[in-house]
UniProtKB/Swiss-Prot annotation:
Species whose genome carries this gene: Sinorhizobium fredii (strain NBRC 101917 / NGR234)
Protein name: Putative replication protein C
Keyword Hydrolase: no
Lineage: Bacteria, Pseudomonadati, Pseudomonadota, Alphaproteobacteria, Hyphomicrobiales
Family according to the record: To A.rhizogenes possible replication protein C (RepC).
Keywords: DNA replication, Plasmid
Single GO biological process annotation from the record: DNA replication
């Protein structure tokens, strides 16, 4: 503003606090402040969503900037442009006068433009004897210049957010493709599981994806999708492990040999002294497979697990493994923690342990941490599901006697 005073609109247009704030901000503009008008305009276009201005309003701002004679906006060159409505309409690609006024008002309300109206409301400039502009009435670009740094920061943030959204969308697309194909192969191969329910859950997640998405709305949906993909992958992995155990004669033979330690074979020590030696503590106890407990025993000790089997029934070890995957998700146990337990204890014992954790879930603050602790102990040979199952059986037997 040339004289630093507050100006009010001409005619019936009323003054607003927003217009007043823009003028006060312009008065605080440092004399040395400057900015390339077209770079600033590009940043303004980038920051458009956060500033709440439309593309048509940006067209009007572009036209106004084209009337500024210099490339660099600065107080030294003056910040008032004074085109007539006809000239402005031509530069704004023939925009109607009523539309032009509406978008100018939007720019003023957004704090990007200020009116400097003459006594009669017309836009013009008065020059001095040297031909320099002495007084001008029209639109002040001072608010735009005063917010240059803010606009550039917003534009940078919008770029980062757009890049983040693009990456999230890419991950979401890959995840959707993976889930669709994994469900398809599970159904084609006849893998046990409630695949109709899983597919319905997947479709419900897809339905929550908004048409106009942001990083904040896509991130939680992607997290749910990735958890679902992990659960499907675990179910298929369990199926593959079961097939490997049942279909590999060498593994079956080794299992039989390990189940009868009194039998001799070619790997036994040759001398009596060696035969009488106790195993060295340095040998890891987990070289021997952990004992698998009968399904009936697990179900008597942990009856709650049956509710999570296919159709609400656990009738086989495979059903127990599938129920354990559902319980893992319900108790917020991470897939990696359960996978580690399967690798250390075997899938049958890991599912039995999950059944025990479910049975005692009211007394366990962190099921995931508890499972990791049991896995570590099992790796050192310090844990077996047997004592836990027996304790639950004894507790259930006592409660049954009290109930009777």
């Amino acid at each position: 503003m040339q004289d630093g005073s507050v100006t009010t609109p001409f005619g019936r247009r009323s003054m607003t606090l927003g217009m007043l704030a823009s003028q006060y901000m312009s008065r605080e503009l440092e004399p040395e402040t400057s900015a390339d008008k077209w770079k600033l305009f590009r940043a303004l276009c980038e920051a458009k969503p956060k500033l709440g201005i439309s593309e048509r309003a940006l067209s009007v701002m572009n036209a106004l900037l084209s009337f500024y004679p210099e490339t660099t906006l600065s107080e030294e060159n003056g910040l008032i442009v004074f085109p007539s409505n006809m000239q402005l309409s031509l530069r704004a690609h023939g925009m109607a006068e009523a539309t032009l006024r509406r978008h100018i008002a939007a720019l003023v309300d957004a704090g990007l433009l200020a009116r400097r109206d003459s006594p009669n409301g017309k836009r013009y400039a008065r020059k001095d004897g040297d031909g320099s502009i002495d007084e001008a009435y029209g639109f002040s670009l001072a608010p735009l210049l005063s917010r240059a740094r803010e606009i550039e920061q917003i534009a940078a943030y919008v770029k980062i957010e757009r890049l983040q959204l693009r990456r999230l969308r890419e991950r979401l697309t890959i995840c959707r493709r993976d889930i669709g194909k994994l469900i398809e192969v599970a159904i084609e191969e006849g893998v046990d599981g409630n695949w109709d329910g899983i597919h319905q859950h997947y479709r419900s997640l897809v339905a929550t994806i908004p048409r106009v998405a942001t990083a904040a709305t896509v991130a939680p949906i992607l997290e749910e999708m990735e958890m679902l993909r992990e659960e499907i992958s675990n179910l298929l992995e369990i199926r593959l492990k079961i097939e490997n155990l049942s279909g590999n004669p060498d593994q079956i033979e080794r299992h039989k040999q390990n189940s009868h330690p009194e039998s001799t074979n070619e790997f036994e020590p040759s001398s009596r002294e060696e035969q009488g030696e106790r195993p060295s503590p340095a040998i890891e106890p987990q070289r021997e497979p952990m004992k698998v407990f009968p399904l009936g025993m697990v179900l008597r000790a942990c009856p709650s697990i049956s509710d999570y089997g296919p159709g609400g029934v656990v009738a086989s070890p495979r059903d127990l493994m599938q129920a354990a995957v559902v319980v893992r998700s319900m108790l917020c146990v991470s897939p990696s923690a359960y996978q580690d337990a399967c690798e250390v204890m075997g899938p049958e014992n890991a599912s039995a342990v999950m059944a025990c954790i479910l049975e005692r879930s009211g007394h366990i603050k962190s099921p995931g941490g508890y499972l990791r602790d049991l896995t570590s102990r099992a790796k050192r040979g310090e844990f077996s599901p047997g004592p836990v199952l027996m304790a639950l059986l004894r507790a259930r037997g006592g409660s049954d006697r009290l109930a009777s």
